């Protein structure tokens, strides 16, 4: 789970768009960039190299 206040602040490092939290995968999703950023030990990992590419 991630604090909703963090979601209001964080943006995709590539597109600068807002992110969506996926509770099933515990990831922050950038729909525009088609990337999923992992959350490890409660810390969002906002590195593009660490993001998982989403299927089109």
Swiss-Prot record:
Disulfide bonds: none annotated. Transmembrane segments: none annotated. InterPro entries: Trm112-like. One of its GO terms (cellular component) is cytosol. It comes from the Bacteria. Belongs to the UPF0434 family. PANTHER family: PROTEIN PREY, MITOCHONDRIAL (PTHR33505:SF4), ZGC:162634 (PTHR33505). This is UPF0434 protein Ecaj_0131. It comes from Ehrlichia canis (strain Jake).
């Amino acid at each position: 789970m991630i604090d909703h206040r963090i979601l209001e602040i964080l943006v995709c490092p590539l597109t600068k768009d807002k992110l969506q939290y996926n509770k099933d995968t515990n990831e922050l999703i950038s729909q525009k960039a088609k990337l999923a950023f992992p959350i490890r030990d409660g810390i969002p990992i906002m590195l593009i190299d660490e993001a998982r590419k989403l299927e089109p």
